[in-house]
């Protein structure tokens, strides 16, 4: 898969952009705050209708403008695609795939897949559990439409349940509606656990190999999926997980009503990471955790290849400059096969190390 051409209109700091990309390596060079990251964000958004940075979609629209558009000529699954996304203040997002309206943003993932790696991802191992849940969610939403739907359903039910518990002291009758949202959370939560467990199983295998190679075989990486304690086997069928979640909800109902909080569920899942058998989040060095995070992102790419038999777009956003020369070399030796976008600053020596089409960005324009 690849993006051949990209057009932006009033997107972030781009007033208007029309650019053609190389099918292999694209190096985007420029000083900080010129628009390099915004360009990669547009590509990620085209692959999933999810921004890796914006809290709300209106942040994507240029300051002072009321609407923006992203358009790309893409090639995937042995055919050409025209992808278009339009955003306007006060109106619903519009997505077209070959001029046909898409019902869900996830339909874009059937065309393009992307692995996005930014400097914040280097903190993936040391950050809280929410960062690792987001890592799983971002990867799985591109791979499994059922997962993306279950995640949306779970979040809606969780928000409703949280409000019910929070307001139940003042409005006790709200508790009568709680069983319905418990049911919905168990149904969608079982799907999340089912796919997360399988993802982490493959993640552990691929990341262990990448980590061993990058560290020179000195350390062993361990990856363990952590979910609700009463789930005896996260790799069990969805129906089994559902029944165990229902039992878990029943046993925690009194405590949840007393605390007026949703105490447990897949919204608290995590990935436990060890390096050399030691808890990586607590005891590993910065270099060790960066190597592990790097292994996670490279493993994500391999999992996508395994499941879809296609190579996703790889976007490295100013991340190579954060790595030491050894890790830089390792990444550069692993990115062949597929379209790659790499950003770096003018003064970085990376521009001379990378062979590919070079774009220089200044003030939201290619110069």
Say what each PLM segment does.
Residues 45-57, 299-307:
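Post-Walker A helix-loop "phosphate-sensing" segment adjacent to the P-loop in P-loop NTPases
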Residues 72, 339-346:
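Structural recognition of the conserved hydrophobic beta-strand(s) that form the central parallel beta-sheet
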Residues 317-319:
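Walker B catalytic acidic pair
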């Amino acid at each position: 898969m690849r993006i051949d051409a990209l057009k932006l209109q009033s997107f972030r700091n781009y007033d208007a952009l029309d650019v053609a990309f190389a099918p292999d390596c694209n190096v985007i060079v420029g000083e900080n705050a010129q628009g390099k990251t915004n360009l990669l964000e547009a590509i990620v958004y085209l692959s999933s209708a999810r921004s890796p940075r914006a809290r709300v979609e209106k942040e994507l629209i240029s300051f002072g403008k009321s609407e923006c558009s992203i358009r790309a000529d893409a090639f995937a699954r042995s055919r050409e695609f025209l992808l278009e996304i339009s955003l306007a203040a006060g109106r619903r997002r519009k997505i077209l795939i070959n001029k046909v309206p898409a019902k869900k943003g996830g339909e874009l993932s059937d065309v393009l897949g992307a692995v996005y790696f930014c400097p914040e991802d280097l903190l993936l191992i040391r950050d809280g559990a929410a960062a690792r849940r987001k890592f799983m969610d971002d990867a799985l939403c591109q791979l499994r439409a059922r997962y993306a739907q279950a995640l949306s359903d779970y979040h809606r039910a969780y928000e409703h349940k949280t409000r019910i518990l929070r307001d139940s002291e003042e409005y006790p009758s709200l508790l009568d509606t709680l069983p319905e949202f418990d049911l919905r959370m168990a149904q969608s939560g079982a799907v999340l656990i089912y796919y997360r467990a399988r993802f982490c199983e493959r993640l552990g295998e691929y990341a262990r190999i990448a980590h061993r190679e990058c560290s020179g075989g000195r350390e062993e990486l361990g990856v363990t999926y952590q979910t609700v304690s009463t789930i005896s086997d996260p790799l069990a069928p969805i129906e089994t997980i559902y029944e165990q979640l229902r039992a878990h909800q029943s046993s925690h109902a009194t405590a949840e009503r007393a605390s007026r909080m949703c105490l447990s569920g897949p919204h608290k899942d995590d990935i436990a990471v060890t390096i050399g058998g030691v808890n990586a989040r607590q005891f590993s060095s910065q270099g060790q955790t960066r190597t592990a995070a790097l292994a996670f992102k490279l493993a994500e790419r391999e999992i996508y290849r395994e499941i879809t038999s296609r190579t996703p777009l790889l976007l490295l956003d100013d991340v190579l400059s954060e790595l030491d020369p050894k890790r830089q070399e390792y990444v550069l030796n692993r990115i062949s096969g597929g379209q790659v976008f790499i950003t770096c600053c003018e003064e970085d020596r990376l521009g001379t190390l990378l062979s590919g089409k070079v774009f220089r960005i200044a003030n939201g324009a290619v110069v």
